[in-house]
């Protein structure tokens, strides 16, 4: 049991290209890239909103202590 060699990966890659064609694979790659970009954007938006809320809560707490 050697595992997966480079030759085996090339054969599998060639079979995938033959089955789906280059246009379909290019389209699939673009869709996958868009999905990853959207996921990263959503994660950044969520963390920005969380940090903004935390800083607002901290400022609100400081205002209460001043009174």
Swiss-Prot record:
Q: Tell me, what is an example of a GO biological process annotation in this record?
A: protein transport by the Tat complex
Q: Say if the entry is tagged with keyword Secreted.
A: no
Q: Where is this region: Disordered?
A: 43-67
One GO MF term attached to the UniProt entry: protein transmembrane transporter activity
Q: Where is the composition biased (Basic and acidic residues)?
A: 54-67
Topology relative to the membrane: Single-pass membrane protein
Give me the segments passing through the membrane: 1-21
Q: Enumerate the InterPro entries for this protein.
A: TatA/B/E (IPR003369), TatA/E (IPR006312), TatE (IPR024905)
Q: Which UniProt keywords apply?
A: Cell inner membrane, Cell membrane, Membrane, Protein transport, Translocation, Transmembrane, Transmembrane helix, Transport
The record's GO CC annotations read:
TAT protein transport complex
Domain of life here?
Bacteria
Q: Decide whether keyword Cell inner membrane is in the record.
A: yes
Which locations, inside or outside the cell, does it occupy?
Answer: Cell inner membrane
Family statement: Belongs to the TatA/E family. TatE subfamily.
Task of the protein: Part of the twin-arginine translocation (Tat) system that transports large folded proteins containing a characteristic twin-arginine motif in their signal peptide across membranes. TatE shares overlapping functions with TatA.
Q: What is this protein called?
A: Probable Sec-independent protein translocase protein TatE
What organism is this sequence from? Erwinia tasmaniensis (strain DSM 17950 / CFBP 7177 / CIP 109463 / NCPPB 4357 / Et1/99)
Q: Which gene encodes it?
A: tatE
């Amino acid at each position: 049991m050697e595992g997966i060699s480079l030759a085996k990966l090339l054969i599998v890659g060639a079979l995938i290209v033959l089955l789906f064609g280059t246009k379909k694979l290019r389209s699939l790659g673009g869709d996958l890239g868009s999905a990853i970009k959207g996921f990263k954007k959503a994660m950044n938006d969520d963390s920005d909103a969380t940090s903004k809320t935390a800083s607002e809560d901290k400022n609100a707490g400081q205002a209460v202590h001043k009174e």
